[in-house]
A protein has these predicted regions:
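Intrinsically disordered, low-complexity linker/tail regions enriched in polar/charged residues
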Residues: 1-167
Length: 167
């Protein structure tokens, strides 16, 4: 006798959001870095963790492929992770971060392939990934430090050159 796995589900479930260029059932964030945060050399040197929320139809041995600004980190879901409430906590090593965009938008997204080779979003999906999580990369070591603005000898984040140009 031969055992055959027949699956009628896809990782992340059926995408219920028409028109988006990502799978709505796949969500993630980066531990300690709200979206839009600056990714600087000290953060990159330590690596960071992607927190992937438990998605519909998560199974042991699903392959989670995390796209990190042009490069991939792969993670296989363990039995303990599949049984847990989530999120998956996947380390993105400094070596991968350093390969990514050095200045400007630094995108992180993921897709899932299950053991039957079903990909998130389904067979005909043009976009099998989660919504991109975007950080602001300042990894380029040639960048200058932020300017320091003084208004009446007090450091200020907001300067109105029309009214404060002589300050």
């Amino acid at each position: 006798p031969q055992t055959v796995l027949v699956k009628t589900t896809i990782p992340g479930g059926v995408d219920r959001e028409v028109g988006d260029s990502w799978v709505s059932g796949l969500t993630m964030r980066v531990e300690g870095l709200p979206e839009g945060s600056v990714l600087n050399p000290s953060i990159a040197a330590s690596g960071m963790y992607a927190l992937i929320d438990k998605y519909e139809n998560m199974r042991t041995n699903d392959e989670v492929s995390i796209f990190v600004s042009g490069y991939y980190v792969r993670h296989i879901v363990s039995p303990a992770e599949a049984a847990a409430p989530g999120p998956l906590r996947v380390f993105i090593p400094p070596s991968i971060i350093q390969l990514g965009n050095q200045s400007g938008p630094f995108q992180i997204a993921f897709k899932v392939t299950d053991v039957a080779k079903n990909v998130s979003g389904g067979v005909d999906a043009s976009f099998p990934f989660s919504k991109p999580y975007v950080l602001d990369s300042e990894l380029d070591k040639t960048l200058l430090d932020y300017p320091l603005f003084l208004v009446d000898n007090v450091e200020s984040l907001l300067v109105n050159l029309g009214t404060q140009s002589n300050s």
